[in-house]
Amino acid sequence: MINIWNKSKTVILALFLLFLSQVPLYYVEYENERQNLFGVANKITVNFILIGLLIILIAIMLGIKNGFYKNAKRTLEWKNIILILILIIPSVALDILFSQFIQFHHLGRMDNQIAIDSVMGSLLWFGKILGVALLAPILEESIFRASIYKIFSNNKIAFVFSSLLFTFMHSGYSWVFLIYLPMSLAVTFIYHRRSDVILKS
């Protein structure tokens, strides 16, 4: 019973973090009374950064409390950094390949990327750095990997579910799924490997 309650709390936490992740996007894309995108019209980089930092702080505090970052320092070991590069480089290459194939054959639109580009276009460079380098990675790690690995007791099932869920949330039912899948598999495998180290230590 306690185990079910703990898993339920993790699901609620993941949904809450998912909600928080949409707040900066909603703020930037809010249409004012002139029906202009509020962020694009007003270049709200400072406000975006303040909202983003608050959300990052909340996410980190909740993550620490729920054990999301246990043993996270191991990711920064040289062998793990090399592994990350080995995985990310071919993943990016596959992303580009699938993207070109899908665009050439008119199989789908990357609506998620278009939305991100719209948001990033309304921010100055330091706002873009916050969004890309801190806000997105921290929230995605918590929502799509740390939470799921706490919900499923079997790490292999967690790996598959996490990879597919992350990909689907970014692509929906479309060929664009193939674009996000390689990167999703790569970053999930990095987290999966760290989780296995934790379990075996």
Swiss-Prot record:
GO molecular function: endopeptidase activity
Cellular compartment(s): Cell membrane
Alphabetical UniProt keywords: Cell membrane, Membrane, Transmembrane, Transmembrane helix
Bilayer topology: Multi-pass membrane protein
Listed InterPro entries: Rce1/LyrA-like_dom (IPR003675)
Keyword Repeat in annotation: no
GO cellular component: plasma membrane
Keyword flag Plastid: no
A biological process from GO: CAAX-box protein maturation
Transmembrane segments: 10-30, 44-64, 82-102, 119-139, 159-179
Stated family: Belongs to the UPF0177 family.
Identification of the protein by name: UPF0177 protein YajF
Lineage: Bacteria, Bacillati, Bacillota, Bacilli, Lactobacillales
Gene for this chain: yajF
